[in-house]
Amino acid sequence: MITIKEKRKTRIGEEFIFSLKAPISFSNAIRRIMISEVPTFAIEDVYIYENSSSMDDEILAHRLGLIPIKGKPLLENEVITFTLEKEGPCTVYSSDLKSENGEVAFKNIPIVKLGKGQRIQIECEAIPGIGKVHAKWQPCNAVYKQIADDEVEFFVETFGQMEAEEILEEAVKILKNKAESFLQQLEMIEQ
């Protein structure tokens, strides 16, 4: 049984505290899935057409990859395309990333500072992935403490891509699918 204790917005997402009556092994499975197997969007492919800034292309691409992208992936091959075109002098922020079908979680993340006459023109694609592959797809941090023999209290801090309840629901679905798959494999062995 899950009991929600507290939920509050922070400047980088949400903090979500809930208790769960379940064995420790089950609680740890939920925690691990929340961190590393719930799919989110992150910028993976970056096409740099022009970059006269002082930042190397590789560093610029890496910075873009770590900007949280809002949304829950519905399809495995779903792609969100962003474009960025800016000329200095100015500071380029995540709000300068433009898309018809996506949105950055935070508009005030500085990407690069452009001097007079410097310019960048970029196209990038955000794709679904999981934190097990790369931390840029990690939707939250999650820890728990044991408060009784069969009860733990979770503390979850999200990074803006998804709501905390969505992450928890998705983790439970993933664990359920894994358990069902395991049972099917056991049935095949018994036959």
Swiss-Prot record:
Signal peptide annotation: none
UniProt keyword Cytoplasm present: yes
Keywords: Cytoplasm, DNA-directed RNA polymerase, Nucleotidyltransferase, Transcription, Transferase
Main subcellular location of this protein, as a coarse class: cytoplasm
Record's keyword annotation contains Nucleotidyltransferase: yes
Job of this protein: DNA-dependent RNA polymerase (RNAP) catalyzes the transcription of DNA into RNA using the four ribonucleoside triphosphates as substrates.
NCBIfam families: PRK00783.1, PRK14979.1
Family stated for the protein in its record: Belongs to the archaeal Rpo3/eukaryotic RPB3 RNA polymerase subunit family.
Protein name: DNA-directed RNA polymerase subunit Rpo3
Gene: rpo3
